[in-house]
Design a protein with these regions (language model features):
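Signature of N6-adenine DNA methyltransferases within the class I
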Residues: 1-151
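Polybasic, glycine- and aromatic-enriched phosphate-binding surface used to engage nucleic acids
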Residues: 137-296
Length: 296
């Protein structure tokens, strides 16, 4: 049999979805995933399903379980880009065709990347290039770093914000300019630069994601420490999990910065993420780090 579809694309409340489907997605479900699940349930042996899907189905980590299930149980026949976007959401789209037959002899590998426990789909040419770009690289996870957003939400702790320089410096995303820490004075009188709370004093690499001239770029700052500070939640923090001297840690961070500036990284981001934002999980587990000094 043949199932052809162009399912709708919108988020749903998890409580509106039967619990038996929770194993196929993480977080808030999107209705197109349910269309895939229900269609696969009805697909006969050797039957084919052909769907137009949002392009982020290929690598969004929320859909990793769905991709794992497909990779293990179905043969991928076609993954190709479509010229039309979803009209209402402006989402880029793909043609996704699979067959209800076991994937034999590595047939699916040309469309699949396995990385740090995640299953990623892609166009054949893109997957081939991405696999090549992982050569002689590592990841922040393998280097024993964790990646998270800052843990201070300034407008939820206004009562302990202060202008006193005797307190802990609160670093906002707008304090990072030209990859340097440049403390800004805010017009909003409630948004103050210091906080009455214990802070960190060691080195830390923070990222402020943004776009410049049509291409994705990292805005980063290496905070060398020596003073008390905390990070507001619009910045991403890259934290090392081992005990090393500040000097050695700064060296590790400088190697990461060199990798972020590497032309291979820029090409990888273009191939893998396109115009989509990079979240903390992807930064930690997916983005290759190229400096040979960091390979374990």
């Amino acid at each position: 049999d043949l199932i052809i579809g162009n399912p709708p694309y919108f988020g749903m409340r998890k409580s509106d979805v039967e619990s038996k489907y929770y194993d196929y997605f993480e977080g808030r479900p999107n209705i197109f995933v349910l269309f895939i699940i229900l269609s696969l349930e009805k697909l006969n042996s050797d039957g084919i399903m052909s769907f137009i899907l949002p392009k982020n189905f290929l690598n969004c980590l929320y859909y990793n379980k769905m991709r794992e299930y497909i990779a293990e149980n179905y043969s991928i026949l076609v993954i190709d880009e479509c010229s039309d976007d979803f009209i209402e959401t402006k989402q880029e789209t793909i043609m996704f065709i699979i067959q209800n037959t076991a994937p034999l002899n590595g047939k699916n590998t040309k469309y699949i990347l396995q990385q740090n426990g995640y299953t990623i789909f892609g166009l054949e040419q893109n997957i081939s290039e991405i696999k090549t770009m992982y050569t002689n690289s590592t990841t922040l996870k393998r280097m024993n770093f964790t990646v998270n957003v800052g843990n201070v939400v300034w407008n939820q702790c206004k009562d302990i914000l202060t202008c006193s320089k005797d307190e802990t410096l609160l670093i906002y995303s707008s304090d990072i300019k030209d990859n340097k820490l440049q403390i800004k004075k805010y017009n909003n009188e409630e948004k103050k630069n210091y906080i009455k709370k214990d802070g960190n004093t060691g080195p830390l690499l923070v990222l402020n994601r943004g776009y410049g001239k049509g291409e994705y770029k990292f805005e980063y700052c290496l905070i060398e420490g020596g003073f008390s500070y905390l990070i507001e939640n619009h910045l991403i923090c890259i934290k090392y999990n081992d005990e090393v001297s500040d000097e050695d840690l700064i060296g590790l961070y400088e190697n990461i910065i060199n990798s972020l500036e590497d032309e291979r990284t820029k090409k990888f981001i273009s191939l893998y993420f396109g115009n989509n934002a990079i979240n903390t999980t992807e930064l930690c587990n997916i983005l290759p780090i190229y400096s040979t000094d960091l390979n374990n």
